[in-house]
Amino acid sequence: MKYKIFASTTPQTEPVLQKLKQVLKGCEAVEKGFDYLFVLGGDGFFVSTVANYNCHNCRVVGINTGHLGFYTSFNEKDLDDNFLQKLQQCHFQRISLLEVSVNGQQHLVLNELAVYTNTAYPINIFIDGEAWEFYRGSGLLIGPRTGSTALAKSAKGAVIFPGIDVLQIIEMNPLLHPNQVTIQSPIILPKETQVEFVVKKAFNPQQFPTFYCDGRKLELPNADTTLALKLVQSTPMFNISLKTQDFINKLKSTFIKQS
């Protein structure tokens, strides 16, 4: 078995990294052509590492050393003599990512594209070529199912269970007055839907919105800009559980506190 490891630099990750290397002692560490890509860290590190990493047919394995673990299947206690056997029993599959096409470049997104504006700068939204909204507010989020427990949840979006392959748009603090009323609710769209955000050049460049793909800022010029958004299949394969019980347990341990 050939493998590659990406590990966060947090203190709690280092002992887990050494333990993983020991477990993989009989395997071959390579830079290219690997069968498995091991990602050690929390969900934030996983997202920043994996979405745009183009490894065809490699299997991505998340090992949690952080707080959230929606993308990780293992933790330190799983790194025992039976780890490789557990790995062979895992089910890997391709998942939907959000493809953001702008200015001739494509960016892949695991959680969300976030659009921010501190001046309620207008954004035209089109769904499958049809004008949907002339939006003004503090920002917009759009992302695949996997992002529904991230920033989307904080913005009062829907938490979407595994097995439902959809696209979600969320308005953040929409500007409302008699002549400007938007839907004010999360929108859940079928996976084949194509969305466009259209932004006109600002007279004052400082008013132009800012765009972030999974927290990475897109350096876009102040100009007429169209972002084409759709779901695409990942080239790597992921071991993200589709079991309802697993997802419920993660939601309860992360977000729900009851006495």
From Swiss-Prot:
Q: Which reaction does it catalyse?
A: NAD(+) + ATP = ADP + NADP(+) + H(+)
SUPFAM superfamilies named in the record: NAD kinase/diacylglycerol kinase-like
Residues of the active site are 43 (proton acceptor)
What Gene Ontology cellular-component terms does the record carry?
Answer: cytoplasm
- Specify the enzyme's EC class, one word: transferase
Which Pfam families does the UniProt record give?
A: NAD_kinase, NAD_kinase_C
Report the leader peptide range.
Answer: none
UniProt key word Iron: no
Q: Which domain of life is it from?
A: Bacteria
Location in the cell: Cytoplasm
CC cofactor: a divalent metal cation
User: Some GO term, biological process aspect, for this entry: which one?
Assistant: NADP biosynthetic process
- GO molecular function terms attached to this record: ATP binding; metal ion binding; NAD binding; NAD+ kinase activity
Please state the Enzyme Commission number of this protein. 2.7.1.23
Entries under HAMAP family matching the protein: NAD_kinase (MF_00361)
Q: Which family does it belong to?
A: Belongs to the NAD kinase family.
- Please describe what this protein does: Involved in the regulation of the intracellular balance of NAD and NADP, and is a key enzyme in the biosynthesis of NADP. Catalyzes specifically the phosphorylation on 2'-hydroxyl of the adenosine moiety of NAD to yield NADP.
- Name of the molecule in the record: NAD kinase
The record lists the lineage as: Bacteria, Bacillati, Mycoplasmatota, Mycoplasmoidales, Mycoplasmoidaceae
